C-alpha cells in the first residue's frame, strides 16, 4: 500500500504531491519481470538507461530484494547540495556479490541524490525523514514559482492512502 501527501507552497499555493510506497497491484512479478502480455513495470519507474542496466542484471540471474513491503517502491531522496526532496523509485537487485540500486542525479546541480533516512519501517514522511543524514532540514521546491520551503511550514493539507 502506498500513501500520498499534499503540501502547498506558502507563496503561490501550488500543490506538491508526494506519493510513497507501492500499490498492492504492483506485485514483484509485474514490476521486475512483467507477464505474457506486458513488459516489466520497472520500465515505467526508471529512466531508460537505468532500466536497461537493471533488466540486463535480472536477465543474467539477478534477484530483486522483495523481502518486505518497503524493500522497493517510491521513496524520498534528497540532494545534499540543494537540500530539496525528490520522490524516486527504489529497489535492490542482487547477483553474486554485486548489489545494484538506482543512482539518481539532481536536475538542478547534477549531484547524486541520497536516499532520505528513516524509511526502513514505513513510508510516512515524518519530520525525521525531512532531514538529511546530517540532520539538516530538507525542503520542497515549488514547481510553479520556485520557492523553496520546509513542508511543515505549509502543513500537509491532505493524506491519501492508495492501493
Report residues per predicted region.
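His-enriched metal-coordination microenvironments in redox/metal-binding proteins
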Residues: 1-7, 17, 163
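Large eukaryotic, non-enzymatic subunits of multiprotein complexes that serve as scaffolds/tethers
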Residues: 2, 15-17, 21, 28-30
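Short cysteine-rich clusters marking metal-coordination/redox-active sites
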Residues: 9-12, 79-82, 106-109, 142-145
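Short functional micro-motifs and their immediate structural scaffolds
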Residues: 17, 84-88, 111-115, 132, ...
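Short linker/helix segments within small regulatory modules
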Residues: 24-26, 65-74, 94-101, 118-141, ...
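Mixed-charge, low-complexity intrinsically disordered segments
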Residues: 29-66
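Short, structured interface segments
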Residues: 72-96
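Disulfide-bonded cysteine-rich modules in secreted/extracellular proteins
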Residues: 101-113
Amino acid at each position: 500500500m502506498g500513501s500520498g501527501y499534499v503540501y502547498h507552497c506558502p507563496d503561490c499555493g501550488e500543490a506538491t504531491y508526494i506519493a510513497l510506497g507501492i500499490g498492492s497491484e504492483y506485485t514483484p512479478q509485474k514490476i521486475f519481470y512483467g507477464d505474457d502480455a506486458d513488459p516489466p513495470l520497472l520500465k515505467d519507474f526508471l529512466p531508460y538507461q537505468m532500466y536497461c542496466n537493471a533488466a540486463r542484471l535480472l536477465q543474467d540471474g539477478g534477484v530483486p530484494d522483495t523481502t518486505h513491503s518497503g524493500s522497493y517502491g517510491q521513496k524520498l531522496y534528497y540532494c545534499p547540495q540543494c537540500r530539496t526532496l525528490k520522490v524516486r523509485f527504489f529497489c535492490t537487485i542482487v547477483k553474486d556479490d554485486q548489489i545494484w540500486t538506482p543512482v539518481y542525479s539532481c536536475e538542478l546541480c547534477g549531484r547524486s541524490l541520497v536516499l532520505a533516512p528513516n524509511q526502513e519501517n514505513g513510508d510516512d514522511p515524518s519530520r525525521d525523514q525531512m532531514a538529511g543524514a546530517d540532520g539538516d532540514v530538507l525542503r520542497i521546491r515549488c514547481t510553479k514559482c520556485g520557492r523553496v520551503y520546509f513542508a511543515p511550514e505549509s502543513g500537509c493539507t491532505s493524506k491519501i492512502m492508495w492501493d
